[in-house]
Regions:
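Non-transmembrane functional regions of envelope-associated proteins
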Residues: 6-213, 251-299, 303-318
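Short helix/loop segment flanking the catalytic signature motif in cyclic-nucleotide metabolism enzymes
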Residues: 105, 109, 442, 471-491
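Conserved nucleotide-binding and Mg2+-coordinating catalytic segments in signaling enzymes
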Residues: 382-401, 422-436, 444
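Short regulatory alpha-helical coupling segments
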Residues: 382-383, 396-416, 447-455, 474
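Conserved metal-coordinating catalytic motifs of nucleotidyl cyclase and c-di-GMP turnover enzymes
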Residues: 391, 420-423, 466, 532
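Alpha-helical scaffold within the catalytic cores of cyclic-nucleotide enzymes
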Residues: 447-451, 480-500, 531-533
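A short pre-motif secondary-structure segment
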Residues: 460-463
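Catalytic-core segments of nucleotide cyclases and related cyclic-nucleotide turnover enzymes
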Residues: 478, 482-486, 503, 511, ...
């Protein structure tokens, strides 16, 4: 029993180790990324994120373009907008328009914009990275120096796009060589809070950020965005703000993001909530980042070590719960409960903990484990249908099927086929003296010896009935079969199993009848069995503890 428990424990440890390695491989290689993102998108679509009414978008829309002319507009127009927002009492302004070079034909507009930025004191401008040439080295594109000096801050506008083209993430700091620029949303928050740029930010840190090359775009403070429904943020037209149509109360003490929404300027972004609807403008993307940060709702990818530990722990849970003696006797219930628990854990962590835990590696290992368990049970059932429960040798049905098959093979090939019938000497006396449990142990130990010798792929050791065992030996001559029988007798005798009631020896002995198929004598299995049985009883009659060839068996 103890050995059985040790084997069971060792098997569980090996299965647990394999499951942990599989989870680790799936996580490290991101092999379940598509399923994980599908689950994330589905959950996110069911958790409505309210839009903060302190956030207002001033849209460069089609109507503004129609009235104010072709894009880009004079910087004097933008200066007028900044002044208008300052007079309305905006909390902070993000002017998401790039002014990288002086306007060749409008230097006055540049000066007006610089003055308006300086006077407002709460307007931030964008920074972006773009290649010098297609596929070339990246450079940071920043506003021209007078505007940098006048602006309250700069923020990068890098929108993180996944491999499927969907924007789910944001990085709160980024830059070339090091993550030195805050995101546009962080820069906008800092204009009102007056906090240091190095303040604690949420998000997953990048451990590789310190080893980046000088011209590598580095991202840090990784978050996932809980998007509000499309159109949830208050939005007014650039033109309406400029001509005073918009009431100051709508802008007072608000974070204002100014940017393009017109399709000709902004191509838009796909998000988990897009579906078949319109794309999200870049400005609305940054509004969602601001919304998450302002309300402490940013979603953090579950940190790597904790993701691994929780995923592996959940994958190993069926091993801890399942036992044939426990209430969890049905494995499909165990696997179903753990799988449902994994999804529930994922959903609750996302909804209330604001952490994203990837569930699919655990679910994949659970599914694979259940399939493997089912296949193992099927194989075990097949073995039980063809094996003897006590000796673990083949049962009588399997013996009959195998003997018939091997006889046909011997008839076709002309190769010899030998059969051993094995009897434990004075087994009834042994049972009477030592009890049936001891008798069962004798049969098991004898069966083990037979299995050691009849070990070729086509050999079959079986329990013929009662205390009689047998072995089918394809392509084995009478002499070879007799030698094998003698070896079995010798090895069982060497076990020194006490048998004080035996008239032959003080330990267990065997008598074996050996018959080799002769196509001239036998017409089938019955004849071969009768010859082996006759040899067995002749061996008993001659004193037992021996092997006896059937009459007429060929020696070679």
């Amino acid at each position: 029993m103890r050995a059985g428990r040790r084997r069971n424990l060792l098997l569980r440890l090996l299965i647990g180790l394999l499951a942990a390695l599989c989870v680790g491989a799936l996580l490290s290689q991101q092999l379940t990324w598509r399923l994980d993102t599908w689950i994330y998108d589905t959950l996110l679509s069911h958790f409505e994120q309210p839009a903060d009414d302190r956030i207002v978008i001033v849209a460069v829309d089609e109507r503004s373009l129609s009235e104010l002319g072709r894009w880009p507009w004079s910087r004097g127009v933008h200066a007028e907008l900044v002044e208008r927002l300052q007079r309305a009492g905006a909390r902070g302004v993000a002017l998401n328009v790039m002014f990288a070079e002086p306007a060749r034909d409008d230097p006055a507009g540049d000066a007006l914009l610089a003055r308006a930025l300086a006077e407002s004191g709460n307007t931030v401008l964008p920074v972006m990275a773009e290649p010098v040439e297609p596929g070339g080295m990246l450079i940071e594109v920043m506003p021209m120096p007078p505007l940098i000096e006048a602006a309250a801050g700069l923020g990068h506008v890098d929108a993180a796009i996944d491999r499927d083209g969907i924007a789910r993430h944001a990085y709160l700091r980024a830059g070339l060589g090091s993550a030195h620029w805050p995101s546009l949303a962080v820069a906008l928050l800092d204009t009102h809070a007056g906090t240091d740029a190095d303040r604690a930010l949420p998000g997953l840190r990048d451990p590789r950020r310190r080893q980046a090359a000088p011209y590598q775009w580095v991202r840090d403070h990784h978050i996932m965005i809980p998007f509000a429904p499309h159109g949830a943020f208050a939005q007014v037209s650039y033109l309406d703000v400029l001509d005073g149509t918009v009431d100051d109360a709508l802008l007072r003490d608000r974070w204002v993001l100014v940017g393009a929404t017109a399709a000709g300027i902004d191509q838009g972004l796909l998000t988990p909530l897009t579906g078949g609807g319109p794309r999200l403008s870049a400005t609305e993307y940054h509004a969602n980042v601001l919304n998450a940060l302002a309300n402490g709702q940013a979603i953090i990818p579950f940190p790597g070590p904790r993701q691994w530990l929780l995923a592996i722990a959940l994958a190993l849970l069926p091993l801890a719960l399942y036992s044939e003696r426990s209430p969890w006797r049905r494995p499909w219930i165990v696997f179903a409960v753990v799988a449902a628990g994994t999804l529930l854990c994922c959903a609750l962590m996302l909804r209330y903990g604001r952490y994203w835990f990837q569930p699919t590696p655990t679910l994949a290992v659970l599914a694979a484990g259940y399939v493997a368990w089912t296949l193992s049970r099927l194989r075990q059932s097949q073995r039980q249908a063809h094996s003897d429960a006590l000796t673990r040798l083949a049962n009588r049905r399997m013996f009959d099927l195998t003997l018939a098959r091997e006889l046909k093979a011997a008839q076709r090939s002309g190769r010899p086929l030998s059969l051993l019938l094995i009897d434990v000497d004075h087994f009834k006396h042994y049972n009477d003296r030592y009890g049936h449990q001891a008798g069962d142990d004798v049969l098991r130990r004898t069966a083990n010896v037979i299995g050691v010798h009849a070990r070729r792929p086509r050999d079959l050791a079986a329990r013929y009935g009662g205390d009689e065992l047998t072995a089918i030996l394809p392509e084995t001559s009478a002499a070879a079969a007799n030698a094998l029988a003698e070896a079995i007798i010798r090895d069982v005798r060497a076990l020194r199993i006490p048998h004080l009631g035996s008239e032959i020896a003080p330990w267990i002995t065997l008598t074996i009848g050996v018959a080799t198929y002769d196509p001239k004598r036998e017409s089938g299995a019955v004849d071969l069995l009768q010859r082996a049985d006759a040899a067995l009883y002749r061996g008993k009659h001659e004193g037992r503890d021996r092997s006896q060839r059937a009459a007429g068996a060929a020696i070679a």
